[in-house]
Structure formats: structure tokens, C-alpha cells
């Protein structure tokens, strides 16, 4: 009886440890994709954004809501030129085939009004479809310069 109990316990632990390692791997993938986003801002890399943004993607920032096409246009042909971008303090929250990533996006560059340094608090919602992660919704809050 003790042998069966021990075997059942080991089998259960093996299943859970496998689930955790899969989750850890998927979390690392999502963090890398978030970093790909930041790098694509600097490069104005439309191909990366087309790969990352799901059809039907929706983005909100402050008082506006925009579509996938609007985001693609803004990051590739917008008036601002991003020269630095990186993420900080990212956390992945998994819900099966859906994940929410929160963190800080720090962006620097120049635009029509001169140089800028921006800090965004972001919440990105990712869905795994056909063995790849795509972002379906994103919200950014631009921290006012007086609060940085």
C-alpha cells in the first residue's frame, strides 16, 4: 500500500513539474516577444508587428482606441522616431492558452515637439493559437513627466 501511495505521489509530482516547466518556457517566450516589440519600435519593423499583432487586435492608450492597422501605421510611419526602447519589471500571468503580461515600457527618441523620454505602464493580452502567441489587446498608460 505504501508503495502505491508513493508511486501515485511521484506520478503527480512529475505531472505538475512538467506543467510548471511548460509554463516557465511559455513565460520566457512571451517575455522575449515583448522584447521583440520594443526592438521593433526602434527599427520600425512592420514585419515583426504583423507577426505579433493578431487580426482584430485592439489598442487603447489614454483617451483613444485604435485598430491593428492604425498601430501598424503609427509605429512604421508615425511622426515620432524611437531611438531607445526597453521593458522593465515584466510579469506573465497565465490562463491556459491566454496570458496577460504587465510591465513598463521605457521609450526615448524625438518627434515634431523635440526629444522625448516616455514611460508606459502596459498590460498586454496574448493568445496562443496554432502553436504561436499573438497579442490580441494592449493598453498603455503614459506616466506624466511630473510623476517620473
Could you describe each region identified by the protein language model?
Residues 4, 16-148:
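A beta-strand edge to alpha-helix "cap/lid" segment located at domain peripheries
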Residues 4-12:
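Sec-dependent N-terminal signal peptides
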Amino acid at each position: 500500500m505504501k508503495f502505491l501511495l508513493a508511486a501515485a505521489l511521484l506520478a503527480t509530482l512529475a505531472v505538475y513539474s512538467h506543467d510548471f516547466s511548460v509554463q516557465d518556457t511559455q513565460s520566457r517566450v512571451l517575455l522575449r516577444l515583448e522584447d521583440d516589440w520594443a526592438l521593433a519600435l526602434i527599427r520600425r519593423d512592420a514585419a515583426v508587428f504583423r507577426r505579433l499583432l493578431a487580426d482584430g487586435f485592439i489598442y487603447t492608450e489614454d483617451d483613444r482606441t485604435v485598430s491593428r492597422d492604425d498601430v501598424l501605421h503609427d509605429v512604421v510611419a508615425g511622426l515620432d522616431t524611437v531611438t531607445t526602447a526597453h521593458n522593465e519589471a515584466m510579469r506573465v500571468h497565465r490562463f491556459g492558452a491566454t496570458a496577460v503580461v504587465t510591465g513598463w515600457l521605457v521609450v526615448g527618441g524625438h518627434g515634431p515637439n523635440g526629444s522625448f523620454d516616455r514611460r508606459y505602464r502596459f498590460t498586454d493580452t496574448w493568445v496562443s493559437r496554432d502553436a504561436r502567441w499573438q497579442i490580441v489587446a494592449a493598453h498603455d498608460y503614459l506616466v506624466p513627466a511630473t510623476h517620473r
